[in-house]
């Protein structure tokens, strides 16, 4: 019995290996993506590359077409992308896992892997808005917390 306790104590003293995959919270996602370019492949084979501008714009292409009125924001444990004007908008939210330098984006709704990506520092692919006005209607990754007063909306705060 004493030998078993000594072995157990010795095993507990061993360093715990790091987890292979870390699930990122919204703040960690923001720190990784903001001001950087996220590029990768969807599980269906399509390629994407988007510069995550600190003002909330997602510049580049989402695999199928150049982005226009594409925006990004973080939530408690997700990154969400909004593509197109309000009248014809698509929204995609993902949880993000990090395995060394590979980011795994899972659909927030069903947890299926949507894409694998890497993050490049800055905007090395020179993604831009091509001189077009961009409309993110307050969907800004660094938007302030919701006010306690119901008189001031998030949209009005983001417009400041």
Name the predicted role of every residue range.
Residues 4-13:
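Bacterial N-terminal signal peptides
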Residues 16-69, 81-160:
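Lipid interaction determinants
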Residues 75-79:
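Short, conserved beta-turn/loop elements at beta-strand boundaries and strand-helix junctions
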């Amino acid at each position: 019995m004493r030998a078993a306790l000594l072995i157990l104590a010795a095993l507990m003293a061993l360093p715990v290996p790091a987890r292979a995959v870390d699930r990122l919270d919204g703040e960690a996602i923001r720190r990784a993506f903001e001001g950087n370019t996220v590029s990768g492949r969807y599980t269906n084979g399509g390629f994407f590359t988007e510069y995550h501008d600190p003002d909330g714009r997602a510049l580049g292409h989402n695999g199928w077409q150049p982005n226009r009125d594409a925006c990004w924001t973080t939530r408690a444990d997700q990154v969400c992308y909004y593509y197109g004007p309000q009248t014809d908008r698509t929204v995609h939210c993902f949880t993000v896992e990090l395995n060394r330098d590979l980011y795994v984006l899972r659909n927030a709704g069903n947890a299926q892997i949507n894409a694998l990506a890497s993050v490049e520092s800055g905007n090395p692919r020179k993604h831009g808005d091509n001189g077009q006005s961009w409309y993110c209607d307050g969907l800004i990754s660094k938007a302030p917390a919701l006010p306690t007063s119901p008189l001031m909306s998030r949209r009005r705060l983001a417009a400041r």
